Amino acid sequence: MTKADIIESVYEKVGFSKKEAAEIVEMVFDTIKETLERGEKIKISGFGNFIVREKKSRVGRNPQTGEEIEISARRVLTFRPSQVLKNALNLSDMVQPPV
């Protein structure tokens, strides 16, 4: 599913114009992005948590040469699905065979 698909779904289900649906979806994504940029956690009940983690710098190895290199510190985004989402995914697997 793409952002355009999400906009189309909001348009069909809520009844806003396509322009309004696009603006709402953009605002939601912008809010999520800005919150994550500040390093804050996002909890969406029944869906899951988006968490920004700090990774320390560490020594890695070039697999071709064996040379040690430093991997710089960085922030990574992780997603932990809620139990409700996990259950919904597993229930849908039981109802419909995978394609």
Curated annotation (Swiss-Prot):
The keyword Transcription applies. One of its GO terms (cellular component) is cytosol. CDD domains: IHF_A. GO terms for biological process: DNA recombination; positive regulation of metabolic process; regulation of DNA-templated transcription; regulation of translation. It comes from the Bacteria. PROSITE patterns: HISTONE_LIKE (PS00045). GO terms for molecular function: DNA binding; structural constituent of chromatin. InterPro entries: Hist_DNA-bd, Histone-like_DNA-bd_CS, IHF-like_DNA-bd_dom_sf, IHF_alpha. Keywords: DNA recombination, DNA-binding, Transcription, Transcription regulation, Translation regulation. Heterodimer of an alpha and a beta chain. This protein is one of the two subunits of integration host factor, a specific DNA-binding protein that functions in genetic recombination as well as in transcriptional and translational control. Belongs to the bacterial histone-like protein family. This is Integration host factor subunit alpha. It comes from Anaeromyxobacter sp. (strain Fw109-5). The lineage of its organism: Bacteria, Pseudomonadati, Myxococcota, Myxococcia, Myxococcales.
